[in-house]
């Protein structure tokens, strides 16, 4: 007898799972630029939008960022904000697309998950 052992080889579908280290998490502190505006979209969804003024570190000037409150809790809080009020917003950055008269349009917006007065 030879020392060989007969074995059946099973073909196994091995799909490599690649790790995804993505993170879309922002925390911003700044002043509310003006009163928030509630909009109803063609889909029926509601969003409350406002802008946050953030002073640049070590540079002159400010950045004004668009904030969107989509959840009912965030919308309620956003509608009570007053101009120049200091707040903290936590959430994530999203790019919104819509059809405009000139074609497809888009803009970046911070989707507020939590809004806190400071």
Provide a role label for each language-model segment.
Residues 2-118:
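Single-stranded nucleic acid-binding surfaces, predominantly the OB-fold ssDNA-binding core
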